[in-house]
């Protein structure tokens, strides 16, 4: 290899000159791999420095033939397939002295026209297969089809077009005319000069920081997939600059829109060190265990173009390190240094960038470029704007709580949503959480100039045909999580959620174009707020008597909130009434009477029952507004209300607190306990405001008893708030009356690390604090999981004990670790005398087996239904289930009866700590169930089903993926749609298959459990009859 010592100093090198120099001195160095015919499955072509330089010469000749005299500088435009022609076109046009406009294919016609007029474009070039746009004729601009990439990469040597300018002569030549995203209006031109590009080359000049160089230099010699638009600054920086300046080998993506399959195609067909992937594509990948598994083979991934949602990053970074980079059209690539993998969301900007973080609000700072004469070779933004000394990026960051040099990108200044009351909030984190839901492809939060936040949701393509209510019902638990992270004024109410079926406008880099979205969906947004104001029926109240007023007020409350079975003395706030309901009720009542009356929100807050509010309104109608309250009467009423609670209980009945009753286990457990005569009262603590209605609907659909309302009281709680966010009245009532707590609510996500469960421990502490101050010593039942001990070394220590697990390597994942930590914390509380503890480790929960309602079904989200659905599509059943071949499953309706026996035992259980391993004591194997399962399916489908080894079954399912996806997209096969759930769990099935052949899994001690529960002791094994019930539930 020849010497290149004669090249100019870093930061003062002209890109066309560097390309010709390295082609001469390092002709065989591979710059790019480009997929043959745009398809990775056909292999990749190497593009060496020599071939690249020759392709530029070939295009120079073609441009000369099209444009005429090379001495006349013109502005030309190129729009094409996402391939190497973008880079070739940039260098060729620069060599010839032309200015190249790169207009994004995503631009509207209006956007294209605006850029043409701004740039003075005279000639339009497009690759084959792209529309040349009819508007060009109106503008009288000639257009032509570009040469195919294969033609340009012909290695036959051509006459070189030499770029002969010196640094001072060429630094102001334009490499390309890029443009802003247009997220706040029409796109604006941003010129990229050769001097601008050279500032990226200036990364070489930056000194070590924390032992590391800027990322471009640090990653020298790596082979990276550049899965970004190559007309965009991100693709240019990490595609062209990185290959030429930093000696990366850049693998270019397949043609077409950059989506998840583009990444997977590359991972399948070429060896990579890393991949450069946009946050929007990472979002899709985070929902695919299959692609995540492939991604984990890389050394790291890089991303830019917008923030990675926390929920997405938390899923990816345990598998492969994430290294974010920051860039902008005006400032190219912002030099940063690699951070610790756990700090993947943060940037460490190199000091030689000359950026400052200037306070913008209490928690946010704006990134600002400040011109420094000593940093001229490393400050690209002042090449773009030479007249400026300071450039405000409008990008807002938050400082790391422990490391002051680390900064996390939060949003653009324009992203802030400002409500009509002046309150501001950041919608991006909430949107990121919403799109982590598998049914949601995009989310947009708005509320500009409004009194309330609203949400638009765009479902993913597999759920577009579902009804709005079905989608919102499924996503609502995620909304509840979002609301816990939002300030109270910004929280999203169900009435302010709308499903749309038109994709949101996007910027060229794939991020949401907020202004365009607001404009494009104005009608939908207005409909949300119109519905909230006018959508409920008006109420007319004849204010002739207090009885009539009371009836009318009840009707008004039901109209604005949907509350049912509201009694006159029910506190509406404990029934789920919130601040938005108050505002709407005040407005409705103020216009409900024939005579003028203004019902203020304060009146509703101080009169929270139908009776009290009716009395207040009636008094107003009769006598005008009265400010005085009869304190003595109110005091006597309050005393009478709670006096009995402070007297000794007349009979030993249970008063039980349950967290999380609206879920699967909670619904059945509430039914069991309410039908137990020894249970007098149950407090149902749930996070959602509409838990009562959800419980009613769930009970009806499952065929459960609907008579539990007399025992159950629904209370909204917040796991992370002080005292769980309970009112003083509810808190005191629980402390005075409760005899037991069943802690059932816990986030179920097997992909999250332990740290993500920290809010659960805050809630656990609050429950223990209630135990400390309770009148009775509370029995605390913690619903744990066998995942807390799935790595128990039974070959050394025997069966998993009915005792505290002393090994912290016993859990199999973050979820299991969180359960184990909770077990140990509660054990400490029990040993200090605060409570009496029972830990219930729940195993595989199967579907119900009793004859119940249509809603009683083994949820299809579980892995067993997924196996059946996939087997139906394949017409083949697996011979075994690997390490899960032993069927120690318990149907959910029987499981909750077992829990009921443990919570309300015939004979009191003695001891401060009790541990129960809840698994079926009778354990047939999967192969025992196969004959009956096979026979049932063959009758149902009048077709034969094979039985094949699990490894082969997994291979068939993987091989059928393209067919399944195709049939789903065409809507031609219900079995294909159902089989998708199996595709999503391929990695899990492979984990089952990876265990030792013939492994029967762990053994679990159950002696104490069976002694305390006769139902479990006498439980039947999983049988053909049970499978028949489950198959019927699934529609087979």
From Swiss-Prot:
Record keywords: Multifunctional enzyme, NADP, Oxidoreductase, Phosphopantetheine, Phosphoprotein, Transferase
Region (Thioester reductase (TR) domain): 658-899
Disulfide topology: none
Region (Adenylation (A) domain): 21-343
Top-rank taxon: Eukaryota
Domain Carrier per the UniProt entry, residue ranges: 544-621
Biotechnology comment: Fusaric acid is phytotoxic to plants such as cotton and banana. It has been shown to induce programmed cell death in plants. In addition to a mild toxicity to animals, fusaric acid exhibits acanthamoebicidal, antioomycete, and antimycobacterial activities.
Domain notes from UniProt: Contains three distinct domains: an adenylation (A) domain that activates the substrate amino acid which is subsequently covalently linked as a thioester (aminoacyl-S-PCP) to the 4'-phosphopantetheine prosthetic group of the second domain, the peptidyl carrier protein (PCP) domain, as well as a thioester reductase (TR) release domain.
Biological role stated in the UniProt entry: Non-canonical non-ribosomal peptide synthetase; part of the gene cluster that mediates the biosynthesis of fusaric acid, a mycotoxin with low to moderate toxicity to animals and humans, but with high phytotoxic properties. L-aspartate is suggested as fusaric acid amino acid precursor that is activated and further processed to O-acetyl-L-homoserine by cluster enzymes aspartate kinase FUB3 and homoserine O-acetyltransferase FUB5, as well as enzymes of the primary metabolism.
InterPro entries membership: ACP-like_sf, Adenylate-forming_Reductase, AMP-binding_CS, AMP-dep_synth/lig_dom, ANL_N_sf, Far_NAD-bd, NAD(P)-bd_dom_sf, PKS_PP-bd
Organism annotation: Gibberella fujikuroi (strain CBS 195.34 / IMI 58289 / NRRL A-6831)
Keyword Acetylation: no
Signal sequence, renumbered to the chain: none
UniProt-listed Enzyme Commission number(s): 2.3.1.-
Deleted gene: phenotype: Impairs the production of fusaric acid.
GO biological process, one term: biosynthetic process
GO molecular function list: oxidoreductase activity; phosphopantetheine binding; transferase activity
Enzyme class: transferase
Lineage, uppermost ranks: Eukaryota, Fungi, Dikarya, Ascomycota, Pezizomycotina
Stored Gene3D superfamilies: ACP-like (1.10.1200.10), N-terminal domain of ligase-like (3.40.50.12780), NAD(P)-binding Rossmann-like Domain (3.40.50.720)
Functional pathway: Mycotoxin biosynthesis
Entry-annotated residues carrying O-(pantetheine 4'-phosphoryl)serine: 579
Name this polypeptide is given: Non-canonical non-ribosomal peptide synthetase FUB8
């Amino acid at each position: 290899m020849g010497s290149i010592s004669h090249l100019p100093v870093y930061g003062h090198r002209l890109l066309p000159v560097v390309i010709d120099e390295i082609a001469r001195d390092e002709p065989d160095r591979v710059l790019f791999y480009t997929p043959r015919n745009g398809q990775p499955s056909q292999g990749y072509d190497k593009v060496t420095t020599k071939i690249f330089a020759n392709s530029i010469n070939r295009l120079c000749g073609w441009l000369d033939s099209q444009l005429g005299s090379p001495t006349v500088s013109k502005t030309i435009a190129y729009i094409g397939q996402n391939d190497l022609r973008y880079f070739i076109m940039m260098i060729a046009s620069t060599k010839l002295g032309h200015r190249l406009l790169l207009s994004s294919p995503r631009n509207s016609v209006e956007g294209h026209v605006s850029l043409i007029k701004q740039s003075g474009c005279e000639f339009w070039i497009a690759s084959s297969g792209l529309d040349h746009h009819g508007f060009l004729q109106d503008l009288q601009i000639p257009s032509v089809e570009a040469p195919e990439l294969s033609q340009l990469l012909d290695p036959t040597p051509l006459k070189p077009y030499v770029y002969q300018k010196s640094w001072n002569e060429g630094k102001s030549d334009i490499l390309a005319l890029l443009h802003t995203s247009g997220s706040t209006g029409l796109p604006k031109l941003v010129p990229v000069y050769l001097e601008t590009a050279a500032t990226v080359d200036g990364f070489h000049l930056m000194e070590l920081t924390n032992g590391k160089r800027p990322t471009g230099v640090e990653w020298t010699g790596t082979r990276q997939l550049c899965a970004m638009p190559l007309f965009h600054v991100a693709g240019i920086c990490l595609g062209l600059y990185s290959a030429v300046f930093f000696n990366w080998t850049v693998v270019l993506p397949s043609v077409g829109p950059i989506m998840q399959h583009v990444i997977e195609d590359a991972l399948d067909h070429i060896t990579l060190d890393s991949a450069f992937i946009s946050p929007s594509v990472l979002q899709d990948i985070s929902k695919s265990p299959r692609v995540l598994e492939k991604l984990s083979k890389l050394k790291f991934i890089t991303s830019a173009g917008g923030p990675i949602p926390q929920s997405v990053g938390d899923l990816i970074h345990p598998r492969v390190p994430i290294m974010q980079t920051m860039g902008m059209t005006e400032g190219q690539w912002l030099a940063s240094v690699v951070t610790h993998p756990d700090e993947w969301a943060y940037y460490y900007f190199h000091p030689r960038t000359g950026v400052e973080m200037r306070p913008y609000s209490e928690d946010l700072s704006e990134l600002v470029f400040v011109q420094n004469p000593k940093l001229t070779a490393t400050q690209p933004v002042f090449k773009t704007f030479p007249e400026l000394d300071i450039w405000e990026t409008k990008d807002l960051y938050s400082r790391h709580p422990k490391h002051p040099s680390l900064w996390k990108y939060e949003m653009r200044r324009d992203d802030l949503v400002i409500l009509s009351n002046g309150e501001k909030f950041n919608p991006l984190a909430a949107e990121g959480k919403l799109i982590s839901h598998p049914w949601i492809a995009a989310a947009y939060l708005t509320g500009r100039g409004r009194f309330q936040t609203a949400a638009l949701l765009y479902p993913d393509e597999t759920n577009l045909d579902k009804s709005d209510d079905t989608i919102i019902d499924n996503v609502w638990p995620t909304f509840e999580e979002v609301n816990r992270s939002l300030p109270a004024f910004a929280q999203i109410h169900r009435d302010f959620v709308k499903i749309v079926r038109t994709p949101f406008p996007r910027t060229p880099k794939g991020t949401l174009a907020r202004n365009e979205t607001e404009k494009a969906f104005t009608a939908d947004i207005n409909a949300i707020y119109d519905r909230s104001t006018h959508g409920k029926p008006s109420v007319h109240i004849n204010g002739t008597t207090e009885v009539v007023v009371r009836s009318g007020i009840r009707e008004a409350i039901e109209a604005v909130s949907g509350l049912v079975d509201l009694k006159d003395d029910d506190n509406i706030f404990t029934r789920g009434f919130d601040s938005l309901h108050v505002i709407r009720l005040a407005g409705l009542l103020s216009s409900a009477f024939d005579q003028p009356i203004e019902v203020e929100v304060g009146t509703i807050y101080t009169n929270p029952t139908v009776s009290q509010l009716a009395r207040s309104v009636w008094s107003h109608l009769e006598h005008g507004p009265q400010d005085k309250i009869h304190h003595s009467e109110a005091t006597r009423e309050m005393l009478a209300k709670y006096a009995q609670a402070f007297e000794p209980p007349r009979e030993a009945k249970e008063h039980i607190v349950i967290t999380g009753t609206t879920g699967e286990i909670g619904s059945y457990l509430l039914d069991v306990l309410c039908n137990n005569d020894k249970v007098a009262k149950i407090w149902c603590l749930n996070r959602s405001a509409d838990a009562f209605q959800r419980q009613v609907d769930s009970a009806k659909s499952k065929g459960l008893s609907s008579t539990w309302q007399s025992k159950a009281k629904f209370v909204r709680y917040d796991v992370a708030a002080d005292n769980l966010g309970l009112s003083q009245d509810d808190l005191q009532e629980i402390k005075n009356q409760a005899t037991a707590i069943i802690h059932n609510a816990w986030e179920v996500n097997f992909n999250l690390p332990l740290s993500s469960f920290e809010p659960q421990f805050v809630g656990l502490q609050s429950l223990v604090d209630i135990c400390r101050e309770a009148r009775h010593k509370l029995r605390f039942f913690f619903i744990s999981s066998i995942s807390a001990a799935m790595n128990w070394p039974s070959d050394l220590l025997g069966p998993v004990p009915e005792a505290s697990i002393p090994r912290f390597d016993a859990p199999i994942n973050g979820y299991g670790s969180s359960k184990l930590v909770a077990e140990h914390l509660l054990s400490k509380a029990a040993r200090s005398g605060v409570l009496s503890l029972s830990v219930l480790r729940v195993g595989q929960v199967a579907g119900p087996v009793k004859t119940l309602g249509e809603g009683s079904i083994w949820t299809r989200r579980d892995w067993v239904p997924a196996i059946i659905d996939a087997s139906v599509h394949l017409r083949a059943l697996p011979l075994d289930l690997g390490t899960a071949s032993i069927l120690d499953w318990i149907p959910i309706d029987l499981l909750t009866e077992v829990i009921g026996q443990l919570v309300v035992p015939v004979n009191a259980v003695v001891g401060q700590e009790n541990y129960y391993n809840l698994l079926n004591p009778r354990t047939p194997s999967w192969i025992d169930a196969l004959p009956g399962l096979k026979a049932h399916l063959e009758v149902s489908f009048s077709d034969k089903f094979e039985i094949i080894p699990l490894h082969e079954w997994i291979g068939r399912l993987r091989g059928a993926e393209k067919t399944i996806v195709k049939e789903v997209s065409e809507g031609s096969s219900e079995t294909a749609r159902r089989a998708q759930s199996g595709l999503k769990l391929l990695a899990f099935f492979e984990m089952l298959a990876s265990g030792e052949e013939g492994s029967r899994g762990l053994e679990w001690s159950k002696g104490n459990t069976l002694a305390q529960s006769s139902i479990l002791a006498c439980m039947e094994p999983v049988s053909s009859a049970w499978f028949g019930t489950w198959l019927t539930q699934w529609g087979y």
